[in-house]
From Swiss-Prot:
Region spans: Disordered: 563-584
Compartment(s): Cell inner membrane
Chief site of localization: membrane
Primary role: Required for the insertion and/or proper folding and/or complex formation of integral membrane proteins into the membrane. Involved in integration of membrane proteins that insert both dependently and independently of the Sec translocase complex, as well as at least some lipoproteins. Aids folding of multispanning membrane proteins.
Keyword Protein transport set for record: yes
GO biological process: protein insertion into membrane; protein transport
Family statement drawn from the similarity comment of this UniProt entry: Belongs to the OXA1/ALB3/YidC family. Type 1 subfamily.
NCBIfam families found in the cross-reference section: yidC_nterm, yidC_oxa1_cterm
Membrane topology summary: Multi-pass membrane protein
Keyword tRNA processing part of the UniProt annotation: no
Protein name: Membrane protein insertase YidC
Length: 584
């Protein structure tokens, strides 16, 4: 490997480290926004700020009669989840997924606010009363406490809040037996002139429960978001010293709160008035508390208002989210939209899905994928290796030129350019395959880090390809390395070292010899904290590279080098005349 190749590899690796650690992708600016965004506020008025302990019947005005009652729970089972609904607030109190477990491989409740529930309607009355429907008791005609919905069936349950004659709120949930999506219909009758500002909010409160062992990783991948005007509005409440808030007017495609692998989204079917996002990380807590809300306008000249939505509380699975048809897959972080996202969406995931139809083990799929990439890039690798072999053969002549024209840089560059042209080589040819593969490697990083397909799928000693394949935990962290030893990165570093040893090189100086040892160590440090799937991919990629390079070295030759013009000796410099010399 010549000097330019190594420098390119080192620079690209450094860029990759800086990029992934500090340079999060910027989102496009929102379009068609009527109000300026308000963010990073030190004080935020929560969507509902009446403490439960302080609430009294008088706090609810004409709703006071509904503030006392008996809570009835309804459990709904389908193929994918077990949900628990409550008549107090007509809210969702529990959501346990059947096909996705927590880090202990046990079922868990995704709903953080499992005491009060996650969903509610919020509005102010003309009398100034702040209403959160989770404080009110609804009635329902369903008498069962548990319902199982078959694969081809649906089940609906309606909750009704009768405030006065011809004044009521009706909420209906519709479950399908074979879908994560839940129908959510709202009907408000007789409230045309009763709601302050003729506006109410449908809110999801509390975000979601963390499912992974690494809380820092969960925090890094948890945020609230809204999709408006074809752009993603994102709110990340990672700073404990601040309370975050975003409020935008306009039509929203959805609002959502996510963790690393799961998302809770509200998807309206008609135009909204805007969105509300808020978040705060409490000191000492390993999670962030998020609130997302959709704003709706109640027409003042109509006696009733109806809105149909879909709720999605489930895995961040690209195919499932994409099938909803509302761009909810944009919640997935695949890096830059113009570079890495196309690789992830149109190359990596489709190939993985295709291979998964025939192969059930994702470790084998990753190995086959690495082989396919090497196969596709073989022409580039062949041209690169031949170019480096020619550069190696030209090395004696290049050293001679450098020696003869060391005092004449312009002439030196001219002669080197002539040699490259006559020999038909490109001094940067060794970097080309690496540069072309870097966007794919970046995209692989994002896919392996965020794709739920790899989660809790093992291969060999790795129990989970979405996290590092630790074989020894230290109990403390070593700077730049981490708190564990992962085996795939060690094997990958060895493969990188061997691959460099057999790769033709045009440089033999001490710095280049040192890079043969330094570069594998750099890769080891970087990949030790990466997902095991990524380490496996790059390990096998380098194993295939070793086999490919060995084959090319056996079959390629430099016999096709053309006859080069001889090096012309540099003319001797004329002696300088001394000033004020005496004439003879």
């Amino acid at each position: 490997m010549d000097r330019n190749s190594v420098i390119g590899l080192v620079l690209i690796s450094l860029i990759m480290i800086v990029w992934m650690q500090f340079m999060a992708p910027e989102k496009k600016p929102l379009q068609d926004i009527d109000k300026p965004a308000v963010s990073l506020q030190e004080e935020v008025s929560p969507v509902s700020d009446i403490p439960a302990a302080a609430a009294t019947p008088e706090s609810y005005g004409e709703f006071s009669a509904m503030s006392d009652g008996e809570e009835k729970l309804l459990t709904v089972d389908n193929e994918y989840f077990t949900a628990v609904l409550s008549s107090r607030g007509a809210t969702l109190k529990s959501m346990m997924l059947k096909k996705h477990l927590d880090s202990s491989r046990e079922q868990f409740n995704l709903i953080r606010k499992n005491d009060s529930g996650a969903l509610s309607l919020f509005f102010l009355t003309q009398a100034g009363k702040q209403i959160d429907t989770r404080d009110l008791y609804f009635s329902t005609a369903v008498t069962e406490s548990q319902v199982t919905v078959g694969a081809d069936n649906q089940f609906s349950v309606t909750y009704r809040l009768d405030v006065a004659p011809e004044k009521n709120i009706v909420i209906t949930y519709t479950f399908s037996g074979d879908s994560y999506a839940i129908g959510y219909d709202i009907s408000m009758n007789g409230f045309a002139s009763e709601i302050a500002g003729n506006e109410f909010q449908l809110q999801w409160d509390g975000g979601l429960v963390h499912s992974e062992k690494n809380d820092d990783d969960e925090l890094h991948n948890s945020w609230a978001a809204a999709y408006m005007g074809g752009s993603l509005l994102k709110l990340d409440a990672s700073d404990q010293s601040k309370t975050y808030r975003e409020e935008q007017s306009g039509v929203a495609g959805w609002v959502a709160a996510r963790t690393k692998y799961f998302v809770a989204a509200m998807i309206p079917s008609s135009e909204t008035e805007g969105v509300y996002l808020a978040g705060k990380r409490l000191a000492g807590e390993p999670f962030e508390n998020y609130t997302t809300a959709l704003k709706f306008r109640v027409p003042s000249d109509e006696s009733s208002f109806k809105e149909s939505l879909r709720l999605y509380v489930g895995p961040i699975d690209y195919n499932v989210l994409n099938a909803l048809g509302v761009n909810l897959e944009k919640i997935m972080d695949f890096g830059w939209d113009w570079l890495t996202r196309p690789f992830a969406e149109y190359i990596i995931l489709p190939i993985f899905d295709l291979l998964n139809k025939f192969i059930g083990n994702y470790g084998l799929i990753i190995i086959i994928f690495a082989f396919l990439i090497k196969l596709v890039t073989y022409p580039l690798t062949m041209a690169s290796t031949k170019s480096m072999k020619k550069m190696s053969a030209l090395q004696p002549m290049m050293k001679e030129i450098q020696e003869k024209y060391k005092d004449n840089p312009a002439k030196l560059q001219s002669e080197l350019g002539r040699i490259y042209k006559e020999a038909g080589v490109n001094p940067l040819g060794g970097c080309l395959p690496v540069v072309l593969q870097m966007p794919l490697l970046f995209a692989m990083f994002y896919v392996f880090r965020s794709s739920i397909q790899l989660r809790q799928h093992g291969f060999l000693w790795a129990n989970d390809l979405s996290v590092p394949d630790s074989i020894l935990d230290f109990g403390f962290s070593i700077p730049l390395y981490g708190d564990h030893i992962a085996l795939f990165p060690i094997l990958m570093a060895v493969a990188v070292f061997l691959q460099q040893k057999i790769t033709p090189t045009a440089q033999t100086n001490d710095q280049m010899k040192a890079m043969i040892y330094i570069f594998p160590v750099m890769m080891l440090l970087f990949f030790n904290n990466m997902p095991a799937g990524l380490g496996l991919y790059y390990l096998m990629f380098n194993v295939f590279s070793i086999a490919q390079t060995w084959y090319i070295n056996k079959t390629a030759s430099t016999d096709d080098l053309p006859a080069l013009s001889p090096v012309v000796a540099a003319p001797p410099k004329a002696p300088k005349k001394k000033k004020n010399a005496r004439k003879r």
